[in-house]
């Protein structure tokens, strides 16, 4: 699964605000979101553990970006203990986690918006909202994958597979 964080900071990154941990399965597109009151390794480990228990399939690995909240000893030890492969994207490559970046917009941003959210009550409400929507998103909301991109003259032609639900 690809794993990424979405900031709910409004227009400014200063101060405290909520984060959404977004996990997307590469093969199926199954997506889970968890609201976090801060960006730290301990909260991420708790969220991954919670998500792992609710998945309808085993969690073989996590692919993360190069943030310090993901690349640390605590997450490495957790993944080693749970037999989860931990891989990271290439440095300075924004497009290495395209599946989860797409789901950040179509799931986390669509449900929570772009405004600033902070505080424990807001995190609790967001997690209730994510739990209420997870089955709809994964059982009934179809998505499709990009199969091929061709450049024909000055035009880009993209070919996608047939839309289907993650489950």
Predicted feature residues:
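Generic recognition of stable, solvent-exposed alpha-helical segments in well-folded globular domains
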Residues: 1, 43-46, 66, 70-74, ...
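Mobile-element integrase/transposase regions
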Residues: 1-22, 30
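Mobile genetic element proteins and their domesticated derivatives, centered on retroelements
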Residues: 4, 23, 29, 48, ...
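Short, flexible loop/turn elements at secondary-structure junctions
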Residues: 5-9, 25-27, 38-40, 68
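RNase H-like two-metal-ion nuclease catalytic core shared by retroviral integrases
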Residues: 64-66, 70-79, 86-112, 153-156
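Surface-exposed, charged/polar loop-rich segments
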Residues: 92-93, 99-143, 147
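Charged, gly/pro-enriched flexible loop segments at helix/strand junctions
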Residues: 134-167
């Amino acid at each position: 699964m690809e794993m990424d964080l979405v900031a709910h900071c409004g227009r400014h990154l200063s101060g405290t605000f909520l984060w959404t941990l977004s996990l997307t399965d590469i093969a199926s597109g199954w997506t889970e979101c968890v609201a976090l009151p801060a960006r730290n390794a301990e909260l991420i480990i708790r969220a991954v553990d919670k998500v792992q228990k609710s998945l309808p399939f085993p969690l073989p690995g996590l692919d993360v970006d190069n943030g310090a909240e993901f690349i640390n000893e605590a997450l490495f030890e957790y993944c080693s203990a749970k037999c989860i492969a931990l891989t990271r994207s290439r440095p300075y490559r924004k497009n290495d986690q395209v599946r989860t970046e797409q789901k950040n917009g179509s799931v986390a941003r669509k449900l929570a918006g772009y405004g600033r959210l902070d505080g424990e009550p807001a995190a609790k409400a967001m997690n209730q909202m994510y739990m209420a929507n997870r089955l709809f998103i994964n059982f009934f909301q179809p998505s499709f994958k990009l199969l091929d991109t061709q450049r024909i003259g000055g035009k880009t032609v993209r070919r996608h597979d047939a839309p289907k639900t993650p489950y």
